[in-house]
Amino acid sequence: MSLTALVRPFFYRRQKQLDLYSTQARQLQMHVLKRLLSKASDTEWGHLHGYSSRMSYDEFAAHTPVSSYEELKGYIDRMRHGQKDILWPGRVKFYAKSSGTTSDKSKFIPVSTDGLHDTHYAGGRDAVVWYLSRHPESRLFDGKALILGGSHAPNYNLPHSLVGDLSAILIENINPLVNLVRTPCKQTALLADFEEKRKRIAQEALHANVTNLSGVPSWMLSVLLQVLEEAGVDRLEQVWPNLEVFFHGGVAFTPYREQYRKLIAKPGMNYMETYNASEGFFGLQDDPSDESMSLMLDYGVFYEFIPMDQLDSPHPEVLPIWDVETGRNYAMVITTSSGLWRYLIGDTVRFTSLHPYKFVITGRTKFFINAFGEELIVDNAEKGLAEACAATGAQVLEYTAAPVFMDEQGKCRHQWLVEFSKEPADLDAFARLLDEALQRINSDYEAKRYKDITLQPLQMLKARPGVFHDWLKSKGKLGGQHKVPRLSNKRDTIEEILTMNKD
């Protein structure tokens, strides 16, 4: 009997629990909230806000402010220095380092032992549960998982306390049994130098029976190209004939889809999106025919949502899951078993279904262009690029865009810098197709483009190969969960990359 067939029954019971998402969402979420309030009742934060398991949702919302990282930073800094019972009971030993705020280079997100197990590892387990339920023929565990991670370092030299990429913290604490079905070895997986790591992974994984991949599409693509180079072949199934699925997350997969289809041309290759972040594991694509993800309702995360049109108001409406609507953009607010309380994570989502709750990620609260009232979000950009690529046969590797407030003629427009893995025959035609697609997708953009009165046609600039890689390297952000900002209301990022583009 294959190992996959042997372990499959252990996942069956969990599948029955996941089926409750359609009918018991409110009950599941209230159970999570009660558990979080009970555990935090004897913490400093819990005492400050009067937490207990008897608290109702309305009381919790009335007593607890919506918080940004800056507002929790003082508490987190004390936790990082070893103080206990601050935002979560006991000492929190792990901190996931992610991109910073306007005042700090990096954020340090607490990851408690509870959070590791009831959220992050639970997400990995449930990805397998749903995958096996959809693919009874799978032989997932008969080979190895190539899991791409970042690196970590000691946290203020406190014993057994680490700070670094979430993926590295997960690898460091993973059940030893998982190492039997994982590659590369831990030493290689946790290397800090991504370029050395990529070569070592390729060499180690080359002769393994890899059946599945897990990681960020952009960084995984770099590793897979190295594998092909080491093997001297041009398609991945020539190296790993039993490869069957890529569990991906961290960035939108749309810009990379065609490149993966060319690298892995075998029929039946599967792709499953996951919504895992430093702050928690929130969603899984349970149906390959539906791009939306199911919201994970029984982890250590309680969800709330702020309508995007109210985000900047002094007293925005904050909605629990049972009050959201489909088709509306929301900023996500989370309360977690790692001590984040009504934390504005910075991601925006739109629900596509309420039974069960399914959603798509539409962007970031800070990654958008709204310099002229056009309200362009990352979801619009991804869809527009996909349409332009489909029409021209081009393939986009990386991109960023920002407003030009006034050019030499006093005109305003959007400026796009795009690195292609396959260039369009006519860059101007590609730009026109993108501009037209954005107008179809976004009525506010269309209104501002009307007769070129407010916005001129977008400007498309071609990036030299590797310039985005070089920019990330200059920031010390190769590998892990680092990514290029797609859209910005400011020109800082695009100006830095444009300067490097001239080199």
Annotate each PLM feature:
Residues 123:
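DNA major-groove recognition helices of helix-turn-helix
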Residues 114-117, 423-424:
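Short strand->helix junction
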Residues 96-102:
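Conserved helicase ATPase motor motifs in RecA-like P-loop NTPase domains
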Residues 105, 141-143, 242-243, 269:
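Short coil/turn connectors at secondary-structure junctions
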Residues 130-179:
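Conserved AMP-binding loop of ANL adenylate-forming enzymes
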Residues 84-85, 104-115, 238, 245, ...:
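Non-catalytic, beta-rich accessory domains that mediate macromolecular interactions or localization
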Residues 1-47, 52, 60-67, 75-82, ...:
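Active-site glycine/GP-rich loop and adjacent strand/helix microenvironment
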Residues 27, 31-95, 106-111, 118, ...:
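Active-site diphosphate/adenylate-binding microenvironment
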